[in-house]
Amino acid sequence: MKNNSHNAKQAPSKAAKPKHDNDVNKAKPKRVKKKAAVKAKLSAEKSDVDFIKIAKSGLHESNAHRGRYDFKKLIASEPALASFVIKNPKGEDSINFSDPNAVKMLNKALLAAYYNIDFWDIPEHYLCPPIPGRADYIHRVAELLDGEVKGKYRHQNVRALDVGVGANCIYPIVGVTQYGWHYTGSDVDPKSIDSAANIVERNVALNGKIELVQQMSESHIYRGVIKPNDRFDVTTCNPPFHRSAEDAAMGSQRKLDNLKANQRKKGVKQQNSPVKQGKPTLNFGGQNAELWCEGGEAAFIRRMANESQAFSSQVLWFTTLISKKDNVRPMRKQLEKLGVKAIRVVEMSQGQKISRFMAWSFMDKQQRKTWIELK
């Protein structure tokens, strides 16, 4: 560069003025380059985190609930479902999805037909989950693990932790029966733990595969559950969404109203099952710990991120569902500040509904490879 500058000074004297102008003009690109260098530096800093966003359309290919429900098969597995079956405007078998009794019976039939679950029940007013969507989360998490190896992950060796297992125990049921995982389920609600334990005890397919732990502190998520010698391949969680009981009640009522409006639009009759009038019983319902916490979903997953750092060497992949899209970016920024090495955001769309989960690991690719080799 010095030689080029020296040669430029040897130009004829009559070009002295233009030379001065050119020198001024040359200064501008230098400032632009400086800005570009700053941007490049920032970009390089961001690239320290291996971030991938993945969009998935439709239910996972391994999900047993692709397409319409096979009511003949379901009724054969759970005959009590027959009394809840109705015809939709197209003349196809269906149920009244605003009737919690019908939804609960459908779940029993689905679990019996596709998951070899002989007994499943939940206490009144506890969350009754839509199984196809819940199952898809587990299938996508299994896909995340498969992405760590050539071929298939050794799923029979997987240890998983479900935060907020609930009375329904749905994620451990899917993980155990579909992949052979060993699951630990935690919950702050003792009644949920008792219900989940009852499900495990009364199903041969789950015996010895699911351990249930009560979280004794409402302010903790992983602390008190993950012991010093524990090593989990993955964690799962469906966090409480609402900020208060009132907010949760309004949200459930809004969902019910939307469902009824949609059914009326399609011409579905609603007087098929004997549901008490007055205060609605919602299949969208649930107990306090299932539906709300102070600060809502954003505050819960923020605590989850902070606490996960203390267990960075004991968990390969942390994951959580995130209902509100606006919570994704702040969560990502927080995880980057905490020093995670890899982040995945997996969007799952089923029709008009879009759900997502975020996964993060404090281990880089080589460390994750070593983890897997040592299993």
Curated annotation (Swiss-Prot):
Residues 1-39, 262-281 are annotated as: Disordered. GO terms for molecular function: 23S rRNA (adenine(1618)-N(6))-methyltransferase activity. It is found in: Cytoplasm. GO terms for biological process: rRNA base methylation. It catalyses: adenosine(1618) in 23S rRNA + S-adenosyl-L-methionine = N(6)-methyladenosine(1618) in 23S rRNA + S-adenosyl-L-homocysteine + H(+). It is an enzyme of class 2 (transferase). Its EC number is 2.1.1.181. InterPro entries: METTL16/RlmF, rRNA_lsu_MeTfrase_F, SAM-dependent_MTases_sf. SUPFAM superfamilies: S-adenosyl-L-methionine-dependent methyltransferases (SSF53335). One of its GO terms (cellular component) is cytoplasm. Keywords: Cytoplasm, Methyltransferase, rRNA processing, S-adenosyl-L-methionine, Transferase. Residues 27-38 have a biased composition (Basic residues). Belongs to the methyltransferase superfamily. METTL16/RlmF family. Specifically methylates the adenine in position 1618 of 23S rRNA. HAMAP family: 23SrRNA_methyltr_F (MF_01848). PANTHER family: RNA N6-ADENOSINE-METHYLTRANSFERASE METTL16 (PTHR13393:SF0), SAM-DEPENDENT METHYLTRANSFERASE (PTHR13393). This is Ribosomal RNA large subunit methyltransferase F. The gene is rlmF.
